[in-house]
Design a protein with these regions (language model features):
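Alpha/beta-hydrolase active-site loop
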Residues: 134-153
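Hydrolase active-site cap/lid region
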Residues: 173-221
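Catalytic histidine-centered segment of alpha/beta-hydrolase-like enzymes
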Residues: 273-282
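Conserved alpha/beta-hydrolase
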Residues: 102, 109-131
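Short beta-strand/loop motif that positions the catalytic acidic residue
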Residues: 235, 241-243, 247
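An N-terminal hydrophobic leader/cap segment in hydrolases
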Residues: 19-72
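Gly/Ala-rich beta-loop-alpha elbow adjacent to hydrolase catalytic centers
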Residues: 158, 162-166
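Conserved alpha/beta-hydrolase "acid-adjacent" motif
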Residues: 248-254
Length: 288
């Protein structure tokens, strides 16, 4: 048994080491391609960034989501899968994060149901049962707009990039029904996410600049424009910002940057909840 335990630990260590090398290997390949065509290599790098490798529904997840009524909406011929649990109180919209799906909210949904809230969850682009081959927060915000026009939520709850997409939607669209916004582990700026990706992959300066150029051509703005902290300053709704001080994915400083601009919001800092921010304390604060 002792030998087996040591062997398994060493195997896990080797697996983690190999996993950490894979991004650098892919980055080196794209850097090499960039020597011949920087435009093509940069486009591939952005496509790689935009394609989730997780977030599909499991059989167990499907069983839970089947307890809600399902409606498929569309944006530019892309399917938007929604799940609805009816209640008599305010309508709450739930937007999950990267490589996740609506089942991520199971615990929160069960708690909100007990309080008789009307609940709407949607699968983001290229996640769960929704359409698209690629994901970005701008497209996600358009999905949220379509869902909001139909179900008229007054409370928005977003996790990670789902929180960012909620703010992009509220800033861009004319939507006056929002009363409360809850942000869980939200990134303050797209540039921070992109810089961490570029560093992880080890991209050259040529590909680095090429990615930024592709983003501006595709979305009409440079990466620096897409900032939760900047875009949130004109939003009047009340808000709660949850962020763990030891979040390994989105730095805690992002929450401080958002709080500084979100005039009607309260920052609730946690310690030990990680990036997922799941637990009784979180849910109880949300439904107060």
């Amino acid at each position: 048994y002792l030998y087996s335990g040591i062997y398994n630990r060493k195997r896990e260590q080797r697996r983690k080491i190999m996993k950490s090398f894979i991004p650098k290997i892919i980055g080196a390949i794209l850097n090499f391609i960039g020597l011949f065509s920087a435009t093509y290599a940069s486009k591939l790098a952005l496509q790689l960034f935009s394609k989730p490798r997780g977030g599909m529904l499991t059989p167990k997840g499907r069983l839970f989501l089947d307890t809600g009524s399902k409606t498929t909406l569309y944006y530019n011929n892309l399917a938007i899968q929604t799940y609805h649990w009816k209640g008599s109180k305010e309508t709450v919209l739930l937007a999950h994060g990267w490589e996740s799906n609506s089942n991520r909210w199971r615990y929160e949904i069960e708690k909100l149901q007990k309080e008789d809230y009307d609940i709407i969850a949607l699968d983001g682009p290229a996640h769960g049962a929704s359409g698209s081959d690629t994901f970005n927060a701008i497209l996600y915000s358009e999905f949220i707009n379509v869902v909001s026009q139909k179900f008229k939520p007054t409370v928005f709850l977003g996790h990670s990039v789902g929180a960012m997409a909620v703010i992009f939607f509220l800033q861009k669209q004319t939507y006056s029904d929002v009363n409360k916004i809850v942000l869980l582990g939200a990134p303050s700026a797209f540039t921070g996410i992109m810089e961490r990706y570029k560093k992880m992959m080890g991209y050259s300066k040529t590909i680095d600049k090429g990615i930024d150029t592709h983003i501006e051509l595709k979305f009409g703005h440079p990466p620096s424009y897409f900032s939760t902290a900047k875009l949130i300053k004109n939003i009047e709704a009340h808000g709660l910002i949850f962020h763990d001080k030891k979040d390994p994915i989105i730095p805690y400083k992002d929450a401080l940057e958002i709080e500084a601009q979100f005039k009607n919001a309260q920052l609730i800092s946690t310690d030990g909840f990680g990036h997922s921010l799941k637990g009784d304390f979180i849910t109880e604060e949300i439904i107060k």
